[in-house]
């Protein structure tokens, strides 16, 4: 996957409600009409006023349907899964039907202009259809003051554990913004807790963000404005998340971040140390895939990384963006490495990890790129014949240094993108593998629904027949055909389908991270189509699990206090009346 999405605006941080207003969940319980009326009133006049008053627009949050759309990288997708899980755990129904939804949660990507254009168009469409809207992701985090975001609720990339509160207030008609950073004693944290409820898009694949932000300051990157500087999760929290995932039937874990290679530098550890700890808890038959890493940081750990990538439960795959094969262009990008560094990493890993798949990214038409610069990039692709290559035409992102540089003409950028794409499609990376027998892990269905999609040890895509017995299993296949991006494999007739030593996966759309009792109750509730109020859900849920709302138990205690206070008032009132 390309690293497609990856700042703080202190004066835009707003609390969900003001101090004078009651907390969102309190409003379900503190109702003005339960306060005793001591003074007599003219009943006829009162009824007439009631008849002439405008109709009530009262809305009880926690029973609406929500449609979630996510653009961008695997980190963004993980955030979207977490938000879906929390909303479902609270009682909202997550729907795949946008027109049927009461609220749209749009989780954006700021890497390229087209992604933001799609995001903006979706906002416009939601407004035309009178949908409630909550915005998330890197676009509103990086530029919350854009005109087309005015009046809309925003949840920041580090505040996704409060999505229920933001949605709740938005449904009530309020516009709220939460853009703060998670900190502990002044130290920036990786983000929301990893043990929050989640709905995995694919129940077999767990995406774990090991850190957020990065250590670089690339001149073209808008993601830095949203995700900020490096902040890593502790190793024990990541290992616990992996263990929980395997207990829920996951058979493949993706480690993601804006730069996995920089992991741990802010907390006194490093990527190899984390990977060795994770390898210890991966069940046989399950696999680990490492996400994008920039050349400067992996250079320090080449020996250890080679050993890890040779491990049978780790895909021999690494995504290392080069962006350009011209040192002068890399300098203008502030990439903090030269082409020789990139080649050293790739050459070393190819030697020490036979068959490894190296994926890379290239930007065509960066400001100042000459024809000679571009030809150097073409030569690099011709030399290494990358089986996975993400070619991106340069788009100047607002507020970045590169946007202020002298731009390459649009037509030149387009032509260079086409030329490099032609080079990429001139070779066939998998033809020589026809006839091989491979072990593949089956994890999903193809887009055309004709095959199941599996991956071999090198994370190369292998299409296999749609046999339900294969899903989530290790299957032995003979490769009989290849294309530009895939191979096709025929299962060996006498080979045993290997079942990983893990639990049965959750059903599609099922919430992870919940206790068994709570999950069963939630499933019964959603399947019957009946929804209790947010208040009753809080009462039932709090006895079984800790929901991802920091005020939950405080609210329950507050409700009890309010109830007792009201009883006291009623008692005092009747004592006074009858005395």
UniProtKB/Swiss-Prot annotation:
Its cofactor is [4Fe-4S] cluster. Its EC number is 2.8.4.5. Binds 2 [4Fe-4S] clusters. One cluster is coordinated with 3 cysteines and an exchangeable S-adenosyl-L-methionine. The chain crosses the membrane at residues 556-578. [4Fe-4S] cluster 2 binds at residues 214, 218, 221. It is found in: Endoplasmic reticulum membrane. Catalyzes the methylthiolation of N6-threonylcarbamoyladenosine (t(6)A), leading to the formation of 2-methylthio-N6-threonylcarbamoyladenosine (ms(2)t(6)A) at position 37 in tRNAs that read codons beginning with adenine. Belongs to the methylthiotransferase family. CDKAL1 subfamily. This is Threonylcarbamoyladenosine tRNA methylthiotransferase. It comes from Homo sapiens (Human).
